[in-house]
C-alpha cells in the first residue's frame, strides 16, 4: 500500500516555511503599492519580484530563515520610510 501523496509533496515544516515566504511577499507587495511615485513603485516591484525569483531554488532551511529575516527587516524599513513620508 503506497502513500497517496505525490512524490514532490512538501513536509509540514517546508509547507510552513513556504507560507511564511508567501506571506512576506504579499506584505512587501502591499507596502510597495503605497509608494507615491510610479517610477519608484515600479522599481521596487521589479526588485522584490526578482529577489524572490532569484532565491526560489533555495533549499537549506537555515539560509531560507535568514532570507526571511532579512526580508522582514527590509519591509520594516520600507514601512517606516512610508510613515515618515506621510507625516
Swiss-Prot record:
GO CC, any one term: mitochondrion
Record-linked Pfam families: Complex1_LYR
Localization in the cell: Mitochondrion
Lineage: superkingdom: Eukaryota
Ubl conjugation found in the keyword field: no
Residues annotated as transit peptide in the record: 1-19
Keywords of the record: Mitochondrion, Transit peptide
GO annotation terms (biological process): mitochondrial respiratory chain complex I assembly
Presence of keyword Mitochondrion: yes
PANTHER family documented for this protein: LYR MOTIF-CONTAINING PROTEIN 2
Family, as annotated: Belongs to the complex I LYR family.
Protein task: Involved in efficient integration of the N-module into mitochondrial respiratory chain complex I.
UniProt protein name: LYR motif-containing protein 2
UniProt source species: Xenopus laevis
Lineage of the species this protein comes from: Eukaryota, Metazoa, Chordata, Craniata, Vertebrata
Amino acid at each position: 500500500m503506497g502513500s497517496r501523496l505525490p512524490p514532490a509533496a512538501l513536509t509540514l515544516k517546508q509547507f510552513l516555511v513556504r507560507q511564511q515566504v508567501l506571506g512576506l511577499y504579499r506584505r512587501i507587495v502591499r507596502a510597495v503599492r503605497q509608494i507615491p511615485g510610479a517610477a519608484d513603485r515600479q522599481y521596487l516591484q521589479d526588485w522584490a519580484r526578482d529577489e524572490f525569483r532569484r532565491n526560489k531554488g533555495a533549499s537549506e532551511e537555515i539560509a531560507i530563515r535568514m532570507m526571511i529575516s532579512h526580508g522582514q527587516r527590509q519591509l520594516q524599513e520600507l514601512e517606516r520610510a512610508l510613515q515618515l513620508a506621510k507625516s
